[in-house]
Amino acid sequence: MTQTLRAGVIGAGVFGGYHAAQYARLSGVSFSGVYDTHPNRAARVAMPLGGRAFADLESFLGAVDVVTVASPASHHAGQALAAIAAGKAVYVEKPI
């Protein structure tokens, strides 16, 4: 049985938008959406790609299996550790 991975992005900037677009086009991947501390930015990136804008990190982590952390660097560690603690596969944009 083939598993569809639910993927999402933390951070709605340039890098987050790039990762979101790549997830949305991959076969075997369902693009869940984007979490950003500014929900309107998350919506701007997620909605055209068929994803949701998440207003809180916990809800976002409940909706994904795989996450890219592409937020400002000062938030990387905390967000990545939260995703790891939630059992998610995590890719962190540099710097880690």
Where are the regions a protein language model picked out?
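N-terminal Rossmann-like dinucleotide-binding module
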Residues: 1-49
